[in-house]
UniProtKB/Swiss-Prot annotation:
GO terms for molecular function: rRNA binding; structural constituent of ribosome. Pfam families: Ribosomal_L4. One of the primary rRNA binding proteins, this protein initially binds near the 5'-end of the 23S rRNA. It is important during the early stages of 50S assembly. It makes multiple contacts with different domains of the 23S rRNA in the assembled 50S subunit and ribosome. Part of the 50S ribosomal subunit. SUPFAM superfamilies: Ribosomal protein L4. Keywords: Ribonucleoprotein, Ribosomal protein, RNA-binding, rRNA-binding. InterPro entries: Ribosomal_uL4, Ribosomal_uL4-like, Ribosomal_uL4_dom_sf. One of its GO terms (cellular component) is ribosome. Belongs to the universal ribosomal protein uL4 family. It comes from Shewanella sediminis (strain HAW-EB3). Disulfide bonds: none annotated. Residues 46-71 are annotated as: Disordered. One of its GO terms (biological process) is translation. This is Large ribosomal subunit protein uL4.
């Protein structure tokens, strides 16, 4: 299959297995959920009554004081006592096989092509790290909410995009399923397309 280059009167021959496969919604969903879960830190800590530091002595005798009976000052109803169901650190990570991850990315790229959300250009860069220059360049292409994918990070382009809320610049190694879905358009250079094909097989 061919992808038409937006800035040149030519087309790029690409693999149908990477850019022309059926959309596997279940697989993409599983990989996106796993990606989000793996980003969770999971660090939290509260103490149970057993972990609270304090005396194990009964605070007052059982009978005769007129007060409610109490056996410990570390119980959850006491100020400074333990928490009933104390939150503990958790590992939320989910394992995703490489084959599944690559399959999900192929599925997403294929769907982007079908929805005309993937824009391929011969090259894309800015002269200086100026947001104004990048904004004008994107406006010419009628792009506002866009992920720009290049073979490697262009420092000028990266710095120019840093202050734009709906624009992000990634190299091929830095793309992930969530970013590809999150942006309205994905702008990819011809060299980056070749790298993507090599990466996804």
């Amino acid at each position: 299959m061919e992808l038409v280059l937006k800035d040149a009167q030519s087309a790029l021959e690409v693999s149908e297995t990477t850019f022309g496969r059926d959309f596997n919604e279940a697989l993409v969903h599983q990989v996106v959920v796993a990606y989000a879960a793996n980003a969770r830190q999971g660090t939290r800590a509260q103490k149970t009554r057993a972990e609270v530091i304090g005396s194990g002595k009964k605070p007052w005798r059982q009978k005769g004081t007129g007060r409610a009976r109490a056996g410990t000052v570390k119980g959850p109803i006491w100020r400074g006592g333990g928490v009933t169901f104390a939150a503990k650190a958790q590992d939320h990570s989910q394992k995703v096989n490489k084959k599944m991850y690559r399959g999900a990315l192929k599925s997403i790229f294929s769907e982007l092509v079908r929805q005309d959300r993937l824009i391929v250009v011969e090259s894309f860069s800015v002269e200086a790290p100026k947001t104004k220059e990048l904004k004008a360049k994107l406006a010419e292409m009628n792009l506002e909410d866009v992920l720009i994918v290049t073979p490697e990070i262009d420092e000028n382009l990266f710095l120019a995009a840093r202050n734009l809320y709906k624009v992000d610049v990634r190299d091929v190694a830095g793309i992930d399923p969530v970013s590809l879905i999150a942006f309205n358009k994905v702008l990819v250079t011809a060299d980056a397309v070749k790298q993507i094909e090599e990466m996804l097989g």
